[in-house]
Amino acid sequence: MQHWLDKLTDLAAIEGDECILKTGLADIADHFGFTGYAYLHIQHRHITAVTNYHRQWQSTYFDKKFEALDPVVKRARSRKHIFTWSGEHERPTLSKDERAFYDHASDFGIRSGITIPIKTANGFMSMFTMASDKPVIDLDREIDAVAAAATIGQIHARISFLRTTPTAEDAAWLDPKEATYLRWIAVGKTMEEIADVEGVKYNSVRVKLREAMKRFDVRSKAHLTALAIRRKLI
């Protein structure tokens, strides 16, 4: 039988839109006996997901900001190479909150899995997981770490180039004034010019944009504008 990583490599080469890609990922997960798949792209504190996990679990995960608690994400950030995990097997080493997290995930058939993290552009990272409802993942053969990273690199590139719509992402918002000022920034206006056009004081524009930068945890207006455009907030 062809290994699931080989199938992912084949899928990455297929022409088509994001629907074909998402359907293909779900089919591969199902064919090889996994509960589902999850692709996470982590840009500093901004996280997007492409996954077929249960919708309720996706909502809960992002609403409660579980990425900060998730032992799999923590491990992926530090290891940067393929690993298996099991909520039950790791239980003795987990905190009370981490055990509760795994217990909650198990309600949706996520008890163990295989995760492949990779470095991506600008110092960010992506990770791809195949999850299982079994207590422990039983690998039929050893997986080459370099080959695994290469495969997920191709999946990451495919998702990026297709500008695939996330199935879930962390909450982000701009109030009306912030959105208005950022739209002006996006077309090249300075804060002084924005204040003049909008009939407000320069300091009002500066404070509003500073508040938004703090909320998005970015250090420049250019970065804030790029995030707002990417997330279709302006």
UniProtKB/Swiss-Prot annotation:
Domain of life: Bacteria
InterPro entries, alphabetized: Sig_transdc_resp-reg_C-effctor, TF_LuxR_autoind-bd_dom, TF_LuxR_autoind-bd_dom_sf, Tscrpt_reg_LuxR_C, WH-like_DNA-bd_sf
Keywords for the protein's UniProt record, in alphabetical order: Activator, Conjugation, DNA-binding, Plasmid, Quorum sensing, Transcription, Transcription regulation
Residue range(s) of DNA binding per entry: 191-210
MF-aspect GO terms: DNA-binding transcription activator activity; transcription cis-regulatory region binding
GO biological process: quorum sensing
Homology family: Belongs to the autoinducer-regulated transcriptional regulatory protein family.
Function, as annotated: Positive regulation of conjugal transfer of Ti plasmids. TraR activates target genes in the presence of AAI and also activates traR and traI themselves.
Protein name: Transcriptional activator protein TraR
Organism of provenance: Rhizobium radiobacter (Agrobacterium tumefaciens)
